[in-house]
Amino acid sequence: MDSSETEEAARMIWGAWSAGEVIPELPEGCRPLNELEGHQVQAALTRVARQDTEGWKIAATSKAGQQHINVSGPLAGRMLAKFVCPDGAEVDLSSNQMRVAEAEFVFRFWKNIPVQQDPYSLAEVLEAVDQLQLGIEIPDSRYIGFTRVGAAQLLADNACASWMILGPEVKVAWKDRDLAEHEVRVLKNGAEVAVGSGRNVLGSPLKALTWLVNDLRRRGQMLYRHQFVTTGTCVTPVPIAPGDALVADFGEFGQARMTFSSN
């Protein structure tokens, strides 16, 4: 793809996103054919939307998630500033076709992680993290048949990014805890609807975090101080509808909350 084709694809994605519409897929003249081209469209999307990348997300961190959207591994996407909300926020679902919520561990960095030749170790990544937050992601796609378009087009679609609720910071010591075994419960309208753990996220949220850092490193993209990484859903995605109230309960770590409307 040349730069004009990349820009055209980004404009089509952002046009559908901002209008609350969906498209079958990107037309052949501006369709990414591999993951590199998909990431190039994703980067152009931030310029077209005039939105900062406040953080990063990881889609398809479980085998079930990968099978659902027909990809062979996880996908990195950007959390645009406009769609990052505080704990307790209300999100409008009127244009959301996926209508699911995901409970996630979110890590925030106190320093830049520059591009380097060698892969970062878990210890190196963890040393750059100063906060663990509790999050709820509300993904979405701008494609009608998002399970069929393939990894390159899903990356162009920002790895199905949409809304992100950043809940409270975990105040208890967590770096010496086994996050893989940490239980996460989701309650919808007061009733428990899903139970999972950090093990559902590439085996561990910290493993997923390290994967994301090195995926960016491999592509020459650094992580910046104060950016966050939300590491994927710990539970089976929970169906949601306007009027629902959701709580992601991380036990002694705390809870993240949000509600849904339809305007």
Segments predicted by a language model, with ranges:
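A short pocket-lining beta-strand/turn micro-motif at the edge of beta-sheets
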Residues: R219, Y224-Q227, D244-L246, G254-A256
